[in-house]
């Protein structure tokens, strides 16, 4: 405790024996031990009291924190945070009101200035030359017209070729037994009909095909009639000799 060695203790004991005497030394040592024990007890009591005080302080802190947590309200913190923003908004509103109020004053002061007489308007004569409302028409290029004429001539040539082929087939389908008078009469009649018919638009391929089929049917009927006439004549000739014999 006091950093005293054995040699120092021996020196102290010798001094005490010499000074105090051998008779009074034991009771003095007892009294010294009792005082040391009392001091130790006092120190222990002080420590216990100090520890209890620390514990109570810690408990008080804990209790205070718990009470703070219970009493904590987020709305209050939000209000505290929004207060500076509200102040800024109020300042901006006041600045805007101040900025608008001078403009109103200026407008009120400028009103009598506008009440002064206005100079009469000068009538400016309109110019004689007027521009057309629509832009001038641009002449179309001749190339598209030539292309259109070539495209129109191609279907005409194709139609003429198809008509020639259909007529050739109709002529080939006619029977050889038709008399020359009919053969001679048909071109004349066709020429007459063609001359009598008014100028009509060129027939399409479908109409030409229909006409060719009609001509084929008429030719077949005429062939059947021509074949039936010689058969009837032969039958009548054969019937006449039988009657003569009877």
Curated annotation (Swiss-Prot):
Superkingdom as given in the UniProt entry: Bacteria
TM stretches of this protein: 1-21
Membrane topology note: Single-pass membrane protein
Keywords for the protein's UniProt record, in alphabetical order: Cell inner membrane, Cell membrane, Membrane, Protein transport, Translocation, Transmembrane, Transmembrane helix, Transport
Example of a GO MF term: protein transmembrane transporter activity
Biased composition annotated in UniProt, kind: Polar residues: 97-112, 187-197
Subcellular location: Cell inner membrane
Stretches for region Disordered: 94-122, 179-204, 225-246
InterPro entries referenced in this protein's UniProt entry, alphabetically: TatA/B/E, TatB
Main location: membrane
One GO-annotated biological process of the protein: protein transport by the Tat complex
Database matches in Gene3D superfamilies: 1.20.5.3310
Pfam families in UniProt: TatA_B_E
One GO cellular component, as annotated: TAT protein transport complex
NCBIfam families the UniProt entry points to: tatB
Function per UniProt: Part of the twin-arginine translocation (Tat) system that transports large folded proteins containing a characteristic twin-arginine motif in their signal peptide across membranes. Together with TatC, TatB is part of a receptor directly interacting with Tat signal peptides. TatB may form an oligomeric binding site that transiently accommodates folded Tat precursor proteins before their translocation.
Protein family: Belongs to the TatB family.
HAMAP family, A to Z: TatB (MF_00237)
Record text on subunit structure and interactions: The Tat system comprises two distinct complexes: a TatABC complex, containing multiple copies of TatA, TatB and TatC subunits, and a separate TatA complex, containing only TatA subunits. Substrates initially bind to the TatABC complex, which probably triggers association of the separate TatA complex to form the active translocon.
The protein, known as: Sec-independent protein translocase protein TatB
Native organism: Agrobacterium fabrum (strain C58 / ATCC 33970) (Agrobacterium tumefaciens (strain C58))
Gene from which this protein is expressed: tatB
């Amino acid at each position: 405790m006091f950093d005293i060695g054995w040699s120092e203790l021996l020196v102290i004991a010798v001094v005490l024996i010499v000074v105090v005497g051998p008779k009074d030394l034991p009771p003095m040592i007892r009294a010294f031990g009792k005082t040391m024990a009392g001091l130790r007890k006092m120190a222990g009591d002080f420590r216990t009291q100090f520890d209890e005080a620390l514990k109570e302080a810690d408990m008080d802190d804990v209790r205070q924190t718990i009470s703070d947590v219970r009493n904590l309200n987020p709305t209050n913190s939000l209000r505290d945070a929004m207060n500076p923003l509200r102040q800024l908004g109020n300042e901006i509103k006041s600045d805007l009101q101040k900025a608008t109020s001078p403009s109103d004053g200026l407008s009120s002061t400028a009103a009598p200035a506008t009440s002064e007489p206005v100079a009469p308007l000068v009538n400016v004569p309109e110019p004689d030359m007027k521009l057309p409302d629509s832009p001038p028409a641009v002449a179309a290029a001749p190339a598209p017209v030539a292309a259109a004429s070539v495209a129109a001539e191609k279907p005409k040539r194709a139609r003429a070729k198809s008509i020639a082929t259909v007529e050739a087939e109709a002529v080939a389908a006619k029977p050889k037994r038709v008399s020359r008078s009919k053969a001679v009469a048909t071109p004349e009649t066709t020429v007459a009909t063609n001359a009598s018919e008014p100028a009509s638009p060129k027939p399409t391929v479908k109409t030409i095909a229909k006409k060719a089929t009609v001509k084929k049917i008429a030719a077949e009927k005429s062939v059947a009639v021509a074949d039936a006439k010689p058969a009837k004549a032969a039958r009548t000739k054969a019937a006449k000799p039988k009657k003569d014999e009877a």
